[in-house]
Amino acid sequence: MRGIRDPRLIPIAEKVMEGKRLSFEDGLVLYQTKDLPTLMRLANLVRERKHGHKTYFVHSIRVSQTNICYVGCTFCAFQRRFGEEGAWDWDVDEVVAWVKERYQPGLTEIHLTAGHHPKRPFAYYLDLVRALKENFPGVQVKAWTAAEIHHFSKIARLPYREVLKALKEAGLDAMPGGGAEIFAERVRRKIARAKVSAEGWLEIHRTAHELGIPTNATMLYGHIETLEERLDHMDRLRRLQDETGGFMSFIPLAFQPDGNQLARELGKKEFTTGLDDLRNLAVARLYLDNFPHIKGYWATLTPELAQVSLDWGVTDVDGTLIEERIVHMAGSPTPQGLTKRELARIILMAGRIPVERDALYREVRVWDRVEA
């Protein structure tokens, strides 16, 4: 590869072009280099080797049945206590009614994540999955992070495997990747002390994969973590993916510095920079060689930067969302949803091929043009 300005990238580029795995030290170089054009070219080489110009999105709706939560993560602006202003807590019928009001033809995914409610029994969550599958046949339910599965395990006094088996029998199709934050214990003690441990998160996803439940993985960055801790997070995911092959995508999530305790403690008002976001996506694409997709989540990146990210290793921009709440309550300035046409246009204008998918990355439609 010609035009490499940082000599440290030469052996890394050779590995990438030969399809060889990068080391932890290689990953640190990618985070440190100022040769961003080469970093971009390498990440794009891998994305096109895996998927060509195809870029995926899903027709989805986001549902948060409650924001009542006892966990107290310091980065969260979503959580509320009982009786607190802005708190909500829906029963099964209210969730179904809410989705029906916003249902659009062609919807393929209902994405459920919410607070850790201290009083709802596990049966409520099973009933909710069943009700959604019954009322919206053919729509896939992607529901509850490993942190929520850990919570269900505690309230039901059941091992992870039994919780996941019951959810799958109720109709669960896939799991999102939230709750991972940063695996480093130093960071988790500060930002998510009461949440599932890193080891617990990984064990839940390992168990889900063994049961045939595909999952995703996230990383929250741009707060107090170091570059080494970001890479350690990816390294643990890569090792689990070697073992199970059950992850579909990796989604880096930029910290949103509004209305939360962590931002106030840090005196932080600025969002991550575009270059940090793009570098992070590129490093992920190069380091996580066994992950099918790296997702540029437009709700935190902005639609414009998500479009640029398609040259930095990204092959998925998430979906229509339809009233996403969690990152927007933390200050994300992006829209709460985009139409399929808007997403397809973003992808087409970047010179890529828009592919509408379902929750399991099965192709639904290839968009060859977008009508004005």
From Swiss-Prot:
GO biological process: menaquinone biosynthetic process
Cofactor annotation remark: Binds 1 [4Fe-4S] cluster. The cluster is likely coordinated with 3 cysteines and an exchangeable S-adenosyl-L-methionine.
Single GO term (MF): 4 iron, 4 sulfur cluster binding
Cofactor: [4Fe-4S] cluster
InterPro entries assigned: Aldolase_TIM (IPR013785), CofH/MnqC-like_C (IPR045567), Elp3/MiaA/NifB-like_rSAM (IPR006638), F420 (IPR034405), FO_synthase_su2 (IPR020050), MqnE (IPR022432), rSAM (IPR007197)
Domain Radical SAM core: 53-292
Enzyme Commission number: 2.5.1.120
Metal-binding is among the record's keywords: yes
Keyword line: 4Fe-4S, Iron, Iron-sulfur, Menaquinone biosynthesis, Metal-binding, S-adenosyl-L-methionine, Transferase
Annotated [4Fe-4S] cluster binding sites: 69, 73, 76
Primary enzyme class: transferase
Catalyzed reaction equations: 3-[(1-carboxyvinyl)-oxy]benzoate + S-adenosyl-L-methionine + H2O = 6-amino-6-deoxyfutalosine + hydrogencarbonate + L-methionine + H(+)
Record's function text: Radical SAM enzyme that catalyzes the addition of the adenosyl radical to the double bond of 3-[(1-carboxyvinyl)oxy]benzoate, leading to aminodeoxyfutalosine (AFL), a key intermediate in the formation of menaquinone (MK, vitamin K2) from chorismate.
Family listed: Belongs to the radical SAM superfamily. MqnE family.
NCBIfam families: CofH family radical SAM protein, mena_SCO4494
HAMAP family: MqnE
Entry protein name: Aminodeoxyfutalosine synthase
Organism the protein comes from: Thermus thermophilus (strain ATCC 27634 / DSM 579 / HB8)
Classification lineage: Bacteria, Thermotogati, Deinococcota, Deinococci, Thermales
Underlying gene: mqnE
